[in-house]
């Protein structure tokens, strides 16, 4: 069954495996998330659930969202995200989803907004090769030619210096090292996108699901 949860990145630490090896992990406060809305093929054309996460003062909720929460008779939340699922029959509006939907050893896909790094050149932003650093070189970190003579303009999509980071990034196939249901914590091996305190989305691994379907 497909599953997903919203969480907050708390930071990174390390734990010891039974064989004594150190494993770098990211600590995520996953849930509790409440099911705010359920969408079905009959009513909306596709199956999905809308999850709410995080506390928010009622004075900060605008009128359209306030009406949305009141319509479904759930408490207002800071974040709302939609998860497409094959089967939504087992979930109902008001159900609470916690970190224990995932187990140790599972593979997950994590999505977040990468940390903004400001204005960056082509070498840092696009991994361009740099020029000679020795005496007599006219360029060191310049991007070089931007195109041919014929068009006499820069084509769209050309890799140029600009703002780096602040984009939606998904890291595939990360392993769940530990789950603490009481504290709603999930420890994920390796780094996940985003700054401390940022919102991240955890879903079951797409590649693992495809491999399992192929094997069957």
From Swiss-Prot:
GO terms for biological process: translation. Keywords: Ribonucleoprotein, Ribosomal protein, RNA-binding, rRNA-binding. One of its GO terms (molecular function) is rRNA binding. GO terms for cellular component: cytosolic large ribosomal subunit. The keyword RNA-binding applies. One of the primary rRNA binding proteins, it binds directly near the 3'-end of the 23S rRNA, where it nucleates assembly of the 50S subunit. Part of the 50S ribosomal subunit. Forms a cluster with proteins L14 and L19. NCBIfam families: L3_bact (TIGR03625). Belongs to the universal ribosomal protein uL3 family. This is Large ribosomal subunit protein uL3. It comes from Symbiobacterium thermophilum (strain DSM 24528 / JCM 14929 / IAM 14863 / T). The lineage of its organism: Bacteria, Bacillati, Bacillota, Clostridia, Eubacteriales.
């Amino acid at each position: 069954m497909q599953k997903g949860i919203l969480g907050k990145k708390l930071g990174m630490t390390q734990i010891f495996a039974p064989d004594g090896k150190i494993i770098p992990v990211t600590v995520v406060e996953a849930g509790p998330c409440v099911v705010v809305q359920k969408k079905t093929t009959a009513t909306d054309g596709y199956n999905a659930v809308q999850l709410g996460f995080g506390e928010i003062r009622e004075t900060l909720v605008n009128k359209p969202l306030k009406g949305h929460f009141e319509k479904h008779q759930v408490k207002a939340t800071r974040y709302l995200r939609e998860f497409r699922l094959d089967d939504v029959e087992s979930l109902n509006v008001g159900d609470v989803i916690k970190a224990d939907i995932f187990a140790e050893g599972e593979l997950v896909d994590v999505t977040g907004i990468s940390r903004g790094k400001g204005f960056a050149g082509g070498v840092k932003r696009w991994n361009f090769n740099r020029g000679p650093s020795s005496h007599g070189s006219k360029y060191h970190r310049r991007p070089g030619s931007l195109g041919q003579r014929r068009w006499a303009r820069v084509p769209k999509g050309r890799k140029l210096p600009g703002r780096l980071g602040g984009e939606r990034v998904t890291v595939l196939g990360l392993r769940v090292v530990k789950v603490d249901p009481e504290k709603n914590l999930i420890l994920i091996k390796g780094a996940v996108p985003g700054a401390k305190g940022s919102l991240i989305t955890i879903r079951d691994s797409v590649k693992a699901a495809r491999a399992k379907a192929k094997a069957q």
